[in-house]
């Protein structure tokens, strides 16, 4: 009997593929073995030309899983990564999931303070570190004393007195071990067993440890293969990614690619010409980007020099993408639109995605299978209807189990009825397309009015002389906050602060005017996924304008 649907709650459809049995590790092990038999390539590093086949990935992940098991790792323990993007990144991720240990990914660019905080939460037994990350990991090990072993991730030989992966495997795997004989461990309760310990965005302070379950991960595999999003199990299909793997966005999209047998083509850094050449040479059908890169591509003079006829999709995620920028880039690549999605680390990536052939300009998409979403009034907390702006709340099988060792923050995020409060402002229309307006905590409070920075950023980006822009509130004793902007000008273009202020003020109502002024910068402060850093912008706006 079908459950009665709640009023003003938007439900996703039934999944095209049923959720498969077994842990995330069991399912990934099966996928790896399945695509290995087909001879498909799993990973390609476009910068170095290195390819790793599914067979090679299957063999080394099974060998590493066996080594960790023999080292003494138990399902309740954790391992961590500290590395930039590299072709080896997902080897310990998969191996850890095979044996039921939780995996905590971090990046070598973390400051010592951030890494100490993250690994202090994770409490890993083993840390897989890149050579770049090793000095910081060694420093952190002095205080995070649970770290028993450091293994070098991106080296074929031992480095800095520490075992590389191959040495670690040889020490802990019996001679003659056959990867095909390895059997992954199932977990007792995948709804409660932690698969990954991700870092929250840290937009309100140091990151929190987000506990993602095996249930959440396997639900994502179902979405990754769902043809409603233009996906299909198609071994060998090349997908280009420049998204950070340690971030939830990069982690879960890549694991989803493995579920489909795709060839993940990786660029460790963004270079405009190399990016376009990679799309051409690898015949990539899809590319996934953070919004920061859309502004660069929108102004690119190189696109027409490459054969990009295989490209059928550009996807955006990790941060809001301005409608006008997305539309402009789609036109440059002769595509009908940009596939958008919306989600959080706490929801195991996107719970709103644009279905194939059902996109709307400015919309993030529709609710995915097995999820339901509502919009609540910011003051009364009552559920709102169509075209009413409020906070977006979500329920579904991929919600985090909670924040690690932080019950207070968990209670603030997930209410007693199980709804996760995203902290984002948005609405849905008559066709159940969702539109994300802004971050609740980013709203500028001017004389009792709420001003969304994203709206002002969109206005600024529409000016032909402005390359990029970010908006934040400047503290004011009388008004509370004044909307202000930092602006990057197009090469060879100039405008005065007054010209920019007058332009914006002519486009918006009185309370949204740029009373906090404008600062000219070389680069808008943003995080790794392209999210604008309002805290840094606020500090820039507090300072007097430097003379040009």
From Swiss-Prot:
One of its GO terms (cellular component) is peroxisome. InterPro entries: AMP-bd_C, AMP-bd_C_sf, AMP-binding_CS, AMP-dep_synth/lig_dom. Its cofactor is Mg(2+). A motif (Microbody targeting signal) lies at residues 546-548. Homodimer. Belongs to the ATP-dependent AMP-binding enzyme family. This is Luciferin 4-monooxygenase.
